[in-house]
A protein has these predicted regions:
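Bacterial Sec-dependent N-terminal signal peptides
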Residues: 1-26
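Pepsin/retropepsin-fold aspartyl endopeptidases
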Residues: 21-306
Length: 306
């Protein structure tokens, strides 16, 4: 009898430890680079449906391809409402029709969830099923919006407050603000760069945009950018092309660049008019994060980076 009780207690303890580990741990998502230089990861949605997810922060809602959404509506468990008027969403200059909207929660792992608005886009399938803004992802244990982006090992983790407290302290820190189009996360800093032997500085507010595969986009419609270009006519501005050879904007080749007091060599600073509603001076892209570890504490408005 005693042996049975001990066995039962051991089983209960193992079960409780398993539950504790699931509720207090973190999910690790392995990132893969697609052909356009962006990052995706695969996970099981709501513990049952596999999905390929596009890593983003330059959007304000979750996006789902229409075909994927309706083929898997039962597993997604969302009430999609058809849009009453013609609506489009501009993603990097390409516009998609918004067919339906929903509000809800999507479980991305044992300890990770997305809560908020969800847009269904027509013909959005481009090697992924959905896109998720990291600022809307939280830990299921305490609801913390703390995202660790490890671009040394290409991993994404969602931390709770306790896990974050055990992180190394050798980070640089800058304040995140949301004074942007659609409240996207941004930082106020100086862009300093060297071009043709001369040094230039542009102060501004820059969106932290993980959907931008480049180093930096400057917004051509922004008054500060316009003044900067007008006052520095000696800058050699070249036509920028995508991988297919199609012109997509203009660019400045910088021998050296400094952004958020972080130094870089040989970077392309793109200038675009494809995002006319953006109000910031620019968007910081993925090449800023290459080979380093960053932590976004969206609750405390802090961006920690190495």
């Amino acid at each position: 009898m005693t042996k049975k009780i001990i066995t039962l207690l051991s089983t209960v303890l193992l079960f409780c430890n398993s539950l504790f580990a699931q509720s207090s741990g973190t999910d690790t998502f392995q990132l893969e680079k697609n052909t356009n230089g962006h990052y995706i990861f695969k996970t099981k949605i709501n513990h049952q449906l596999m999905a390929t997810i596009f890593l983003e922060s330059g959007i304000h809602v979750m996006l789902i391809d229409s075909l994927y959404a309706f083929e898997n509506s039962r597993h997604l468990n969302l009430d999609f409402v058809k849009t009453k008027r013609y609506e489009r969403m501009n993603l990097g200059g390409r516009k998609y029709k918004i067919t339906h909207k929903a509000t809800g929660t999507i479980q991305l792992g044992d300890n990770t969830k997305y809560s908020g608005e969800i847009f269904v886009l027509s013909n959005y399938h481009s090697g992924h099923d959905m896109a998720i803004p990291i600022q809307r992802i939280s830990h299921s244990n305490d609801g913390a919006h703390i995202i660790k982006l490890d671009m040394k090992n290409y991993r994404l983790q969602v931390l709770n407050r306790k896990l974050f407290s055990s992180e190394p302290t050798n980070y640089n820190t800058i304040t995140i603000n949301y004074d942007t189009y659609q409240n996207m996360p941004a930082v106020r800093t100086d862009l300093c760069f060297k071009h043709k032997g001369k040094r230039y500085t542009l102060s501004g507010n820059f969106v932290l945009d993980l959907g931008n595969a480049s180093f930096l986009f400057l917004m051509k419609q922004n008054p500060a950018v316009q003044d900067f270009l007008k006052n520095n006519t000696e800058l050699k501005i070249q036509t920028a092309y995508n991988k297919k050879g199609v012109p997509v904007g203009e660019a400045i080749v910088a021998e050296q660049a400094n952004l958020c007091k972080k130094s870089f060599k040989q970077q392309i600073i793109a200038i675009t008019s494809a995002l006319p509603k953006f109000t910031t001076e620019g968007c910081i892209g993925l090449k800023f994060f290459d080979g380093s570890i960053s932590v976004f504490d969206f609750d405390k408005h802090e961006f920690h980076f190495q």
